[in-house]
Amino acid sequence: MDKKTTQLHHYHLSQEAKFIDFGDWSMPFSYEGTLKEHNIVRTSSGFFDVSHMGRLEIQYSQIEKISNLICSELIDIPTNKALYSIFTNEEGNALDDVIFWKFEDKIILIPNASNLDKIKSHLTTHNVEYIDKSEDTVLIAVQGPDTIDLIQDRFEIPDKFSTNHTENYLYARTGYTGEDGVEIMANNEDTESLLTFLTEKGIKPCGLGSRDTLRLEASLPLYGFELTEDITPVEASLSWTLTNKNDYLGSERINKQLSSENHKVLKKFIIDSRKIARTETVGIAGETKGLVTSGNFSPILNLSLIHI
């Protein structure tokens, strides 16, 4: 079966991107090399096509229903704020980690690409109405310390983890790299204009290879590795997301884990080596003590990082 491509695929081809299969998608892995793109984001500004991720529009009237399904408090956060949270199942395990953009009259929910259908089904099961905007829009993440200065003549920049909008764009000051920046949602017909603006500002395209090294360097989780349907937010060291004080799906088990140390937990380590640790068990004296969930080389530290 042919892989899906985003609205920006023609641009990636024109830039001679190297592609990688990412679930059902064919996505750019790199353009000029992962190391160079990593350093671009750490020192100036780069942009990522993340349109493989979902964009679900939900009316404000549905907010209470959603709040019963996630581990964070969504109702009480101010309008024009962004929220990172986790959908949990009946056992308290993670169905997906997501971003919410809260506007005056609606919410934009951004699930991971591999979990979009699962989250849509989950919302339908719990009578949450939504409009899937994923095929009608693009999502571009512009990241790096120079980003705000470069784009502020077109975008009125909100505070960190806040949202804003123009006539053509919805956006939030969020990201997945550990750097400052914005993530921009645009209708398909506005894609070329946005690309032209970014490239004329000298902002370079970056692929998923550097996005992974950047997120690992920033100790950010990746669904399917640090989070799965067998791992709770507590076990993934994401207890800081547990701001929902109500009874939400799986909250009973999660609350028990909060008052106990008898559960697995995610830890982050630096290896004094350039060797990249792959997914494998970690043992002491022949006894398995853990599992490497992610491992990669840190270009900034010149060492390898792992999550166990």
What is the role of each PLM region?
Residues 1-88, 93, 209, 301:
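Acidic, proline/glycine-enriched N-terminal capping motif
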Residues 50-54, 96-97, 105-107, 137-138, ...:
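Short, surface-exposed beta-edge/turn micro-motifs
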Residues 63, 99-222:
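Acidic, low-complexity central loop/insert segments
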Residues 231-237, 241-306:
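Glycine-rich, small/acidic residue-mixed loop/short-helix segments
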